Amino acid sequence: MSSMTPQEIVSELDRHIVGQNGAKRAVAIALRNRWRRQQVDASLRHEITPKNILMIGPTGVGKTEIARRLARLADAPFIKVEATKFTEVGYVGKDVDSIVRDLVEVAVKQTREADMKKVRVRAEDAAEDRILDVLIPPARGAGVDTARTGEPAGDSTARQVFRKKLREGQLDDKEIEIDLADARPQFEIMSPAGMEEMTEQLRGMFSQMGQERRRARKLKIAEAMKLLVEEEAAKLVNEEEVKTRALANAEQNGIVFIDEIDKVASRQEAGGADVSRQGVQRDLLPLVEGTTVSTKYGMVKTDHILFIASGAFHLAKPSDLIPELQGRFPIRVELTSLSVQDFEAILTQTHASLVKQYQALLETEGVTLDFTPEGITRLAHIAFEVNERTENIGARRLSTVMERLLDEVSYDATRLSGQTVVVDAGYVNARLQSLSQDEDLSRYIL
């Protein structure tokens, strides 16, 4: 898992997310504590449980983006789920245990990919040998030497010449016929909600039936090389060891991000749909507190999985969550609404800002977009004003406004090839001011 310091994590998040320093610090400390726990003596390590985080803030201020960026930094099994997808056991919908099953799937995939990278050099050598065996069939009686030295006796010079050409890509377009494992047919089974695990087991059982079949395929060497490397790497990876390590990784380092947690908060004691909402909260309790979940790879304990929940809490309040669940999220972080200055920073300072994205897109058509500082300031003001007068959707408003602003340029890009379009305050006002001031229009268009 990642050994980045809290300062390094916050610095990396700053490249993509403006403001929200409290939330960044909280997730940075939580991520660093995962690493610290691994350094503690084994006798005490089991007693140290993660401090779960609840992020509270309006939509579009960076809650989900923090989760997305954290997934890349964590170098640990990470899954993001929507609380609204789950229902109480017995109702139509997914049960919360599937969160852990999905996390384990991520861990297995992550571990397998890491192991395949380690054996890639050996797999590439084996794939090269198989291709060379087709191009220069080994002489009879050379089998012993081939197994011992990797080069057929009496044929090493020609083989080395072809190996050099193969590595330099000179033979990529040559077509050869090779034997490849025929992928077992996938049995598609439609499963009722809540029975995904049983369906997966049935699918796995059917796919294992019968022996592995091989068939000859005609392919270009470049494509054959990719397929052979994958096949050889799969042979070198110990699947049982992968599963064992993946289970341990999910248990010790797993991170679950639960978005839209406010949507399962009940505002009052009521029947109907709220029964299912409270049921989801009750089902989440043992998962967050620590329980054992059965997966197809084995049993998984959730005691040391870190849970980060987030919600806008427009209609409900954090206190509307059942008290037991509130207690399972001891760290609470409030994210603030975005100001005009924040909008400007989002447009100019982030690593992959909307300005850079649109410039890169239109550059493919030969159109140069030049945003002046005044144009960006005016754009930020309009996005902020529309948010204030209509629904506040945070930074997502910038995407809507930018799309409307550059609608004509995007449409006529082929005709404008070779030209420079200057986006200044006048350009922005001409295309957006009337819309932003008309509340009825801005409600539907911006």
From Swiss-Prot:
Disulfide bonds: none annotated. It holds the Pfam family AAA_2. ATP binds at residues 18, 60-65, 259, 324, 396. It is found in: Cytoplasm. GO terms for cellular component: HslUV protease complex. GO terms for biological process: protein unfolding; proteolysis involved in protein catabolic process. GO terms for molecular function: ATP binding; ATP hydrolysis activity; peptidase activity; proteasome-activating activity. Keywords: ATP-binding, Chaperone, Cytoplasm, Nucleotide-binding, Stress response. Signal peptide: none annotated. It comes from the Bacteria. NCBIfam families: hslU, PRK05201.1. Belongs to the ClpX chaperone family. HslU subfamily. A double ring-shaped homohexamer of HslV is capped on each side by a ring-shaped HslU homohexamer. The assembly of the HslU/HslV complex is dependent on binding of ATP. ATPase subunit of a proteasome-like degradation complex; this subunit has chaperone activity. The binding of ATP and its subsequent hydrolysis by HslU are essential for unfolding of protein substrates subsequently hydrolyzed by HslV. HslU recognizes the N-terminal part of its protein substrates and unfolds these before they are guided to HslV for hydrolysis. This is ATP-dependent protease ATPase subunit HslU. It comes from Acidovorax sp. (strain JS42).
